Amino acid sequence: EDVKPNVTPLRWMIDNGYQDPRTLERRAKAMEEWLTNPTLLEPDPDAKYFKIIEIDLNEIKEPLLACPNDPDDVKTLSEVTGTKIDEVFIGSCMTNIGHFRAAAEVLKQVDGSLPTRLWVAPPTKMDEHQLTEEGIYNIFGTSGARTEMPGCSLCMGNQARVAANSTVVSTSTRNFPNRLGQGADVYLASSELAAVSAALGKIPTMPEYMKYMSEIDTMSDEIYRYLNFDEIAEFIEASDRAKSIPLTNIQNVA
């Protein structure tokens, strides 16, 4: 159920001029072939692991953040509560479409302008398109968020950068010194926690966080639903068009 919907966007990419069409079509055909007889990777029966780490999720009672500027320096929310936040980045490959819907639900609860500078960058153009169709981008615009071109954006720090010496909450993968901005202190957090921090201008307390999350929890099925490309007319039509492009008529070569 996770593989089948993702054949469609590969052909959508072909229809929209992405390179290389033959490579994309080969991948699509390989996925379709696998779907006729799906098999999963399994470890050898006698496999020996270097290390086995067991994490009891029942012991995690509150959100976790990676602190400036080391992704391994992890603390609980209560340990960093109240830290003033200047900028917030919600984006990069660590996010999916549900995270942006959740962030929008947080922003809808804010009266007036945000006390922070908020950056938003969906990971793909497909996410951007669907979020626009759903009206989520209108919510970002009303809140004053800066919407970036889909992709890495602040995560790489080469398309744009936060203000020097600012304190930031980010959903990106790393927070090494000077990566997002010169002298910036960067916390790594979930999209939901990042959105609440943007709304408050600080890292929230647990009660503040739970207040915002209570609204999201009631709509979780709708917010976090997958983007099933094979059920969206525009993507289906583009996929069908791509199948007729001569460059995608791939033949296996012995």
Task: Please report, for each region that a protein language model flagged, where it lies by residue.
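Fe-S-dependent hydro-lyases/dehydratases of central metabolism
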Residues: 1-254
